[in-house]
Amino acid sequence: MSLLFLDTFAGISGDMFLGLLVDLGVPLPSIQEGLDRLPVTGYQLHQQRTERQHVAACKIIVEHEEQHHHRTWRDIDRMLAESSLKPTVVDLARRIFRRIGEAEAKIHGRALDEVHFHEVGAIDSIVDIVGAAVGLDYLHPDRIVCAPLPLTRGTVHCAHGSFPLPAPATLEILRGLPTVGDTAEVELVTPTGAAIAAETAEFGDLPAMTLERVGYGAGDRQLSDRPNLLRGLLGTADDPWEGETDRITILECHLDDANPEWLGALMEHLLEEGALDVAFAPLQMKKNRPGVHLTVLAPQDKTVALARRILRESTAGGLRYQEATRFKLRRQIERLTTPLGEVHIKLFYEGDKLLRLAPEFDSCQKLAQSSGLPLPEIYRLAEQTAYDFFRKKG
């Protein structure tokens, strides 16, 4: 499994990430070819060898004539939809833009469609975000891990004036993700950089890996206390996971005053809304009240809808959420014939290796009802049929 580790000792921005990808071996012409598929003109893209505190790095420079072009979320979404980019590239770029847009919408108290992108709607930010999606598609690491992002103090100047660091949009984007405090008084993590990391990486320490390449993407400033670089380590994970991974949101809250009948209905409604899993666990709460701990595993695009459902249909006054990477076994259903009829068997694979199998409950229950035999006996028959089938199959 190929692994990319983002060492964010000096933070992350869109242009630093793009420079890192090029320094790791992504050809700039390949990124340019992808950007040419957008209905955006009037800019030139260059790479430059530079150094930060005597460390050589790649700096990406975007030259353009555009002045303060404010694009809306609909403009960005339409631009991506009308492009001839690969669907996977469009999907990642859209998720990065949307994450920034949702942060801006929350800060300004507006709907997403009413948000005007200022800095992020400019040509150079469009190049950074779409270029990052194109470059990652070329590099195609199986897994990306990012170190916790450094949050600094000071002020930053933007279209709405001066704001204290960390920038409000950056904080919204990084909700639920690991960060560390930093004594620098300059912006190290930009909203674009934060959104790229949040949408592409899991967060943690450097995993065990066989290192193959190291790249450096340069930021604009010369920092006094460290090289202003985003460092990337590309290699192979020493203990590769050959199954699947995805990103989910975990929603949680404690309830001590909910009618149990409502909770049963809430679980049904959450699953109908698209939750991957819903669980209740008993706990003892303040004032010695018995309560329940609600946990919901949500696809990222269903997070807000499921959170709204919880808050509307339970007694919760708030809830916690965090994003997580999920390791998954690939699932497959095999239909096998037993002396009593057809039964469905669930197969679980890591990569191409079959790890286990299990009879599917509904089909076993149907056979138990039609045959009059106990359900455990049907399970044993289904398991034996499956083991015999796969033993012969090899």
UniProtKB/Swiss-Prot annotation:
Keywords: Nickel. The keyword Cytoplasm does not apply. The keyword Kinase does not apply. It comes from the Bacteria. GO terms for molecular function: lyase activity; nickel cation binding. PANTHER family: NICKEL INSERTION PROTEIN-RELATED, PYRIDINIUM-3,5-BISTHIOCARBOXYLIC ACID MONONUCLEOTIDE NICKEL INSERTION PROTEIN. Belongs to the LarC family. NCBIfam families: nickel pincer cofactor biosynthesis protein LarC. This is Putative nickel insertion protein.
